A protein has these predicted regions:
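An N-cap/entry alpha-helix motif that binds or orients negatively charged groups
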Residues: 1-43, 268-272
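C-terminal extensions of enzymes
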Residues: 1-8, 235-272
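Active-site cofactor/substrate anionic-group-binding motifs, chiefly glycine-
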Residues: 36-78
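Glycine-enriched alpha-helix->loop->beta-strand junction motifs that scaffold or abut catalytic
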Residues: 64-70, 83-88, 109-113, 147-150, ...
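Alpha-helix-loop-beta-strand connector modules within alpha/beta enzyme cores
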Residues: 82-91, 133-153, 185-208, 239-247
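Catalytic cores of alpha/beta
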Residues: 98-109, 158-171, 195-208, 212-228, ...
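Glycine/Thr-rich beta-alpha phosphate-binding loop at enzyme active sites
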Residues: 112-140, 157-196
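Glycine-rich phosphate-binding active-site loops on the catalytic face of alpha/beta enzymes
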Residues: 121, 169-187, 212, 218-238
Length: 272
């Protein structure tokens, strides 16, 4: 079994430990998954991660691979672009600061919703990959945030310590994803999320980015406190959305604000 498969198994087991509680005696007929996010009204908390595909609708968000867009010339340092990026979070690999800053300036010129550093790329440094090791300090993050002029996200936060550093550095948001600990047998995203939420909720926006197989998994992350769920999946967004709507109806949650711990069952101890 590959290391990636082992991580998937841990992620799946952690998610399945949170069981949805059916509530059928209520008056919820239709559900509303919209919210106001960074001043923009969006229809769904599901945020797909893509290489070069614009959001499915003006009221949807998406993560885009900024390194890919820069390398292919689809972003060239002004407001003209193959896509309208005002609904996009543009994710960069955390390289050297001297190389990052010119990229940040080019990306900011396109007026994206936010920029992000994809810290999960550091899991692929030697001896497990060819990505160069360029960690970022609190001061680096604060400098990038100041230079960006748009909200800065950190994708791939997998510990309370890093979440606290991110909060202290003044970033807008973190995305919790244990892929950063791929080769460390790190805790699954759903396992570490509650600790991170308890530590920094209210000081930084917290999103989830772990394994998502269905809209039911999206619901689980939302119940743990995620504002949105960043999804690396080939599944159609509409299918995930239909499944999330189903989960909300069957648990009596009319809006995203209704989704919370009371909608899930997570036994702490097994009976001996």
């Amino acid at each position: 079994m590959s290391v990636s498969d082992e991580l998937q198994q841990r992620e799946q087991a952690a998610l399945e430990s949170y069981q949805l509680l059916p509530r059928l005696l209520h008056t919820v007929d239709a559900v509303d998954t919209s919210s106001v996010f960074l001043g923009t009204r969006v229809d769904t908390p599901i945020v797909p991660m893509r290489y070069n595909t614009a959001p499915d609708a003006p009221t949807h968000l998406c993560f885009l691979d900024a390194d890919h867009l820069l390398a292919t010339g689809e972003i060239d340092g002004d407001e003209s672009s193959a896509y309208d990026l005002q609904q996009c979070v543009l994710a960069l690999t955390p390289g050297k600061m001297g190389a990052l800053m010119p990229k940040v300036r080019k990306l900011v010129a396109t007026k994206p919703l936010a920029l992000a550093l994809d810290m999960t790329k550091l899991a692929d440094t030697p001896p497990y990959g060819e990505q160069r090791w360029h960690p970022r300090s609190r001061e680096d993050i604060a400098e990038l945030q100041a230079a960006a002029g748009v909200p800065l996200w950190l994708y791939g936060i997998a510990s309370v310590a890093d979440a606290e550093v991110a909060s202290e550095a003044g970033v807008e948001a973190i995305v919790v994803d244990s892929s950063s600990g791929l080769h460390l047998a790190a805790p699954a995203t759903a396992d570490i999320f509650p600790d991170i939420f308890d530590a920094v909720a209210g000081t930084v926006a917290i999103h989830a980015g772990g394994l998502v197989r269905s809209g039911i998994d999206v619901f689980r992350y939302l119940a743990l406190g995620a504002e949105t769920v960043v999804v690396r999946s080939d599944r159609a967004l509409t299918n995930l959305q239909h499944e999330l709507n189903y989960a909300m109806r069957l648990t009596g949650c009319a809006t995203l604000a209704d989704i919370g711990y009371e909608a899930i069952f997570a036994p702490l101890f097994e009976e001996s």
